[in-house]
Amino acid sequence: DNERYESVMNKKILIAENPSAGARDKQSLLSDLKEGLIERGYQVEQESDQKRIQDILAIGDSTNEEKIECVICAGGDGTIGFVANCSAPATPLAILPLGTENVLAKQLGFDCDINRLMDKIESSKTFALDAGEANGQLFLAVASVGFDAEVVRLLSARRTGHIDHTTWIRPILQALGGYRFPKIRVRTEGNEKAVHARWAFVFNVPRYALGLRFVAEGDFADGRLDLCCFRGGRWWNGLRYFVGVLFGWHRSWRDTHVEQVTQIVIESDEAVPYQLDGDPGGELPVTIRVLPGRLTFVGRSPVADS
């Protein structure tokens, strides 16, 4: 134990916390994590202010004295995306999943077992992860255009604190009543002609919220993104697509387009929102590309274990 303590002594860990992530307050879990890391010999700083997190990471990237050994993203998918956008490619990241869906954490093997998390950090093992970039902003799991991006926009506009799955009901009903499913054009390097659709999903990982699998591949370390487009508008088509994705039928449908890509341009003649990892991204047009190996995470790669 003394040798282990000495090996990590003076190594700095930043806990980047989103205090409004998920359905309830998780301060007791965060306190236990911080105390456990200190007991193992680490210097620990816990911060929830986004500007302060940016400053700490910028200083850590520029000086060896303030180097960050690991950043623990304590929140949901949006929290991880924020930290990723502030971090250098070689900065090791870890996840304490405190969000509603925790899409990325589930697929990378992170859970709320703080002892397992500390063991991963202490092992010094890391693996690389591709990232997507949308108009200069990183995303880790998914970028999407259309109805669900409108739901994200509506939720973000009224969000005041912790959320759970029921929080999504009102913005979903609002979007069902008001969203007009405008046409979008999706241009990829693999097609001379644009794909005309009303929904578009761009995945860096295999699964979406609720464990839905839109694409067959979704390997987060293959240097490619997975595109899934739906051409039909209206809510009843959305219900049909949901059932199709649930049972894996949709990929053979004539009004579905699935393709692996490295760069995509999505545009529309109308104002259409897009979202990145559950946070609003803006409005079209958007240029999306893959950044191979852009991120570093602690632990063993799930690809190696599969």
Where are these regions (language model features)?
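Catalytic core of DAGKc-family lipid kinases
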Residues: L14-A16, R40, E47-S48, C86-W199
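A generic structural signal for short beta-strands and their flanking turns/coil linkers
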Residues: R180-P182, H196-R198, A221-D226, Q260-T262
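Glycine-rich phosphate/pyrophosphate-binding beta-alpha loops
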Residues: S144, D148, F201-V215, P280
